[in-house]
C-alpha cells in the first residue's frame, strides 16, 4: 500500500509484515503521521486507540511504506458502524426550546386568566350597572359578546409571529454568517450557540493553523529570525540551499508537492518569502533522503566551483559534529558557545517546537566531523494569531474553553499556554489515561478548572459532553473526524470543521468553513444576537398582550363592554406579530453581547427587567386608551362633542389608533436595553421600514376601515393628539430604564 486509502468496509487491519506511515487526520484530526508496524512483542493494544502501532483503520491514508495486513473487523462492528448507530440518535431539546416551552405555559396561563377576568368583568359591569338582561336571548347575546372577546384575547396572547421570527432570523443571520465562513444547517445550532457555557475545541487546524510551519531560524550564536525576508543575504543563500535542495518536496505550478509534512513546511517557508526554492537544482550531484538510523538527509551539489554537502536532521546529532558555524553575515566562526545554543533548543522544545539542524561541509560525504552549522530551525503547527484574541473574547463572554487533542501532553500544554488557555495554577491539563482514572463524580469536580485534554480518544469527548450536560451546562463541541461524530451529535451544538469528513458535517449543527476558532466566536456572537432578537420581539409582543387584556378587562368596569372590537384585536395581532418579526429579524450583531455571561439552560427567557418594561409600557397604553375613552377633557380635545352628542365611535377610533401607534413606538424601546432608543438604528433599516409601514397602515385602517373595523375618520387635530400620546411611551421608558439602571 502506498499513498492509498486504507480499505473500504473494514474497521481495522492488523499488520502482519512490513511498516507504513499513515495519515489519520480523517479520524483524529491530527496532522502528524502515525507509524504502523508488526506487533512483535505480542503486547495487547486498545484497538480503539488510534495511536496504537499495529492497527490500520479504514479512512486513513497510507503515505509511505509497504505492509501486509489481516482484516480483523467488518460490518456494523466496525468503528464506522458503531459511530453510525450513535449518530442516528437525536433526542436533544435545545435551551431555547426549553425556555420557550416554559414561556408558552406562562402565556397560556396569563391568557386564560385574562379571558376569564374579561368575562367576569363584562357580567359584573352589566349586573352592577342595573342593566340586567330581561330575556333569554339578551343573556345569550351578552354571553356571546363576552366569550368572543375572551377567546380573541386568548388568540392574541399566543405569539404566532415567533416561528416566523426564528425563520427570518435564521435566513438573515445565515447569509451574514456565510460571509464569515460559518454555515448553519440546523437552526437549533444557531439558537444554542448563543447560550454556550462550555466549548470543547480541537487543537489542530482550529486553535493552530493545521499545518507545520517554520516559526524561527537561529544561527550558532543564537541570532533569531522569524522569516526568510529578515535573513541577511549571505545567510539567506545558505539556508535556501540547505532546506530547499535538501528536500523531498518540490514547488511546481503554484503548489508544493511530495515529501512529508516537515519537508513541505520547509518548502513553504521559502515559497512564502518569494524565494526560488528550485534554484541551482541542476547543480545537485546526489540526494539521500532521510535515514531513520542516521537521523538526517543529505544533498551534494556543485557550489561556487567546488563540491559541498548539506546535512539536515536531528539538531543534537548535527551540532555534536560541528566545529564552526555561520553567523548572520555568513562568516565562518568557531562554535564555542554550545551550552548557549543547547539552552535555546531546550527552550524551544518546551514550546513544543520540532527542531531541525542544517549544516554543511566540503566534499561529497557527510559522515565525518568538522561540520559548519548553518542554522537551527524551529518548526511547529503554530497557534493562529487571531485564535488567541478570539479565545480571550470567548472567555470574557463567560464561556469556558477546553482544548481536546490527540497530541502528547507536553505539546498540548505548550500550545494551550500560548493560546491563553492555561493561565492560572488552578488550571488543569489531563491526558486520556488520567481522565479514565477519574470517576464521573470526580470529573465533574475537576471540570470547572479543566483546560486541556491530551491524547484524547473519541470516547473521552462523548464522556466530557455527557458529564458537562449533567452539570446543566450548555456544551459545544468541535470535530472533523468520523470518530468525532457521536460527540458532535450529543453536544448541545456541534461545530464541524469545513475540512473534515462528511460524516462529521452531517452530525454537526454548524460547519466552520475555514476551521478557524475566530469563526466559532462569530457563530457564538450571531447566536447571542438571535437570542437577543427573540427577547426584543417578546418584549414587544407581550406588551401588546398585557395592554390588550388590561384594556379589555377594565373598560367594562367603566361602562364600555367593547372598547376594542374583536376585528380590531385580530388586526392588531396579525399586523404586530408578522411585521414585528420582520423588524426584529434584522437586528445587528453587537460585540457588546460578548461581554455578557451565558444564560443558564433552565433560566427563564423573560427576565425581571423585561417584565418591568412590559408592565410599565402595558399600563401606560391601557391608561391612555381609557383616558381617551372616558376623560371629558380629552374627549373635547379630540372633537367627540362637536355635534353636542358624544361620538363614541370617534373615541373608539382614537383608542384603536393610539393603541397601535403606541405599540409601534414601543418597538424603539424594545430593541435596546440602553436609555438611547435610537442607537444602531441605521444598521437595521428593516425596522424603520416596518415602523413606517405600521403607522401608514394605522392611518389607512382608521380612515377607510369604516363599518368593518367599527371606526370613522379622525380630524388632523385628533391624529396629532393620538400621535403625541402614543409617542410619549418612548420618554416614559427612557425614565424607567434610567431608574432601573441606578438600582443595579
What are these regions (language model features)?
Residues 670:
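A C-terminal functional module that forms or caps the active site or interfaces directly
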Residues 622-630:
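Transmembrane alpha-helix/helix-exit interface in multi-pass inner-membrane proteins
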Residues 576, 622, 652-667:
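Generic alpha-helical transmembrane segments
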Residues 600-619, 645-653:
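Membrane-water interface at loop-to-transmembrane-helix junctions
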Residues 1, 5-598, 602-606, 619, ...:
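Conserved cytosolic headpiece of P-type ATPases
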Residues 556-565, 630-650:
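Helix-coil boundary and interhelical linker segments in multi-pass alpha-helical membrane proteins
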Amino acid at each position: 500500500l502506498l499513498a492509498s486509502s486504507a480499505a473500504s468496509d473494514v474497521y481495522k487491519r492488523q499488520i502482519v509484515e512490513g511498516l507504513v506511515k499513515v495519515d489519520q487526520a480523517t479520524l483524529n484530526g491530527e496532522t502528524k503521521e502515525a507509524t504502523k508496524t508488526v506487533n512483535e512483542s505480542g503486547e495487547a493494544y486498545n484497538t480503539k486507540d488510534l495511536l496504537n502501532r499495529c492497527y490500520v483503520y479504514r479512512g486513513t491514508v497510507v503515505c509511505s511504506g509497504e505492509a501486509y495486513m489481516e482484516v480483523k473487523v467488518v460490518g456494523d462492528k466496525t468503528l464506522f458502524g458503531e459511530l453510525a448507530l450513535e449518530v442516528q440518535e437525536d433526542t436533544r431539546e435545545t435551551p431555547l426550546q426549553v425556555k420557550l416551552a416554559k414561556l408558552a405555559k406562562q402565556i397560556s396561563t396569563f391568557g386564560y386568566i385574562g379571558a376569564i377576568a374579561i368575562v367576569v368583568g363584562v357580567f359584573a359591569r352589566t349586573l352592577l350597572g342595573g342593566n340586567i338582561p330581561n330575556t333569554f336571548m339578551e343573556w345569550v347575546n351578552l354571553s356571546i359578546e363576552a366569550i368572543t372577546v375572551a377567546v380573541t384575547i386568548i388568540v392574541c396572547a399566543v405569539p404566532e409571529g415567533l416561528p416566523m421570527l426564528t425563520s427570518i432570523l435564521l435566513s438573515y443571520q445565515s447569509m451574514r454568517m456565510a460571509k464569515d465562513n460559518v454555515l448553519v444547517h440546523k437552526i437549533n445550532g444557531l439558537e444554542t450557540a448563543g447560550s454556550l457555557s462550555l466549548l470543547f475545541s480541537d487543537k489542530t487546524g482550529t486553535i493552530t493553523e493545521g499545518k507545520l510551519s517554520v516559526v524561527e531560524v537561529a544561527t550558532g550564536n543564537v541570532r533569531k529570525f522569524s522569516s526568510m525576508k529578515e535573513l541577511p543575504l549571505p545567510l539567506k543563500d545558505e539556508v535556501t540551499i540547505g532546506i530547499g535542495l535538501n528536500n523531498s518536496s518540490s514547488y511546481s505550478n503554484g503548489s508544493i508537492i511530495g515529501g512529508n509534512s516537515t519537508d513541505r513546511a520547509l518548502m513553504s517557508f521559502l515559497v512564502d518569502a518569494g524565494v526560488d526554492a528550485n534554484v541551482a537544482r541542476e547543480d545537485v550531484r546526489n540526494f539521500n533522503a532521510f535515514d531513520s538510523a542516521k537521523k538526517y538527509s543529505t544533498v551534494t551539489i556543485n557550489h561556487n566551483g567546488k563540491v559541498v554537502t548539506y546535512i539536515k536532521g536531528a539538531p543534537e546529532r548535527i551540532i555534536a559534529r560541528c566545529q564552526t558555524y555561520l553567523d548572520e553575515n555568513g562568516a565562518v566562526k568557531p562554535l564555542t558557545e554550545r551550552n548557549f545554543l543547547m539552552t535555546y533548543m531546550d527552550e524551544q522544545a518546551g514550546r513544543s517546537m520540532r527542531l531541525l539542524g542544517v549544516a554543511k561541509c566540503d566534499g561529497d560525504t557527510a559522515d565525518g566531523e568538522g561540520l559548519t552549522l548553518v542554522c537551527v530551525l524551529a518548526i511547529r503547527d503554530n497557534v493562529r494569531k487571531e485564535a488567541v484574541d478570539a479565545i480571550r473574547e470567548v472567555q470574557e463572554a463567560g464561556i469556558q474553553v477546553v482544548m481536546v487533542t490527540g497530541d502528547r501532553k507536553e505539546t498540548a500544554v505548550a500550545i494551550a499556554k500560548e493560546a491563553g488557555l492555561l493561565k492560572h495554577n488552578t488550571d488543569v491539563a489531563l491526558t486520556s489515561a488520567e481522565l479514565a482514572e477519574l470517576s464521573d463524580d470526580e470529573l465533574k469536580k475537576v471540570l470547572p478548572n479543566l483546560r486541556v485534554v491530551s491524547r484524547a480518544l473519541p470516547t473521552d469527548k462523548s464522556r466530557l459532553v455527557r458529564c458537562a450536560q449533567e452539570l446543566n451546562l450548555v456544551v459545544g463541541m468541535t470535530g472533523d473526524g468520523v470518530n468525532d461524530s457521536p460527540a458532535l451529535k450529543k453536544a448541545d451544538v456541534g461545530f464541524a470543521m469545513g475540512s473534515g469528513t462528511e460524516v462529521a458535517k452531517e452530525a454537526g449543527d454548524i460547519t466552520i468553513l475555514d476551521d478557524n476558532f475566530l469563526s466559532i466566536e462569530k457563530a457564538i456572537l450571531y447566536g447571542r444576537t438571535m437570542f437577543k432578537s427573540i427577547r426584543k420581539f417578546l418584549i414587544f409582543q407581550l406588551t401588546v398582550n398585557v395592554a390588550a387584556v388590561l384594556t379589555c378587562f377594565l373598560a367594562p368596569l367603566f361602562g364600555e363592554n367593547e372598547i376594542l372590537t374583536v376585528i380590531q384585536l385580530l388586526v392588531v395581532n396579525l399586523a404586530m406579530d408578522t411585521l414585528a418579526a420582520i423588524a426584529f429579524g434584522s437586528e445587528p450583531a453587537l460585540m457588546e453581547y460578548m461581554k455578557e455571561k451565558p444564560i443558564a439552560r433552565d433560566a427563564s427567557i423573560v427576565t425581571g427587567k423585561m417584565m418591568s418594561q412590559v408592565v410599565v409600557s402595558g399600563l401606560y397604553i391601557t391608561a391612555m386608551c381609557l383616558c381617551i375613552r372616558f376623560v371629558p377633557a380629552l374627549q373635547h380635545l379630540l372633537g367627540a362633542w362637536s355635534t353636542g352628542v358624544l361620538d363614541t365611535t370617534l373615541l373608539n377610533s382614537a383608542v384603536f389608533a393610539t393603541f397601535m401607534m403606541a405599540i409601534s413606538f414601543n418597538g424603539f424601546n424594545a430593541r435596546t436595553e440602553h436609555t438611547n432608543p435610537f442607537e444602531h438604528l441605521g444598521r437595521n433599516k428593516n425596522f424603520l421600514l416596518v415602523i413606517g409601514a405600521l403607522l401608514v397602515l394605522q392611518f389607512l385602517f382608521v380612515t377607510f376601515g369604516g363599518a368593518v373595523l367599527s371606526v370613522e375618520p379622525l380630524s388632523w387635530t385628533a391624529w396629532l393628539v393620538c400621535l403625541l400620546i402614543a409617542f410619549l411611551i418612548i420618554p416614559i421608558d427612557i425614565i424607567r430604564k434610567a431608574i432601573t439602571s441606578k438600582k443595579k
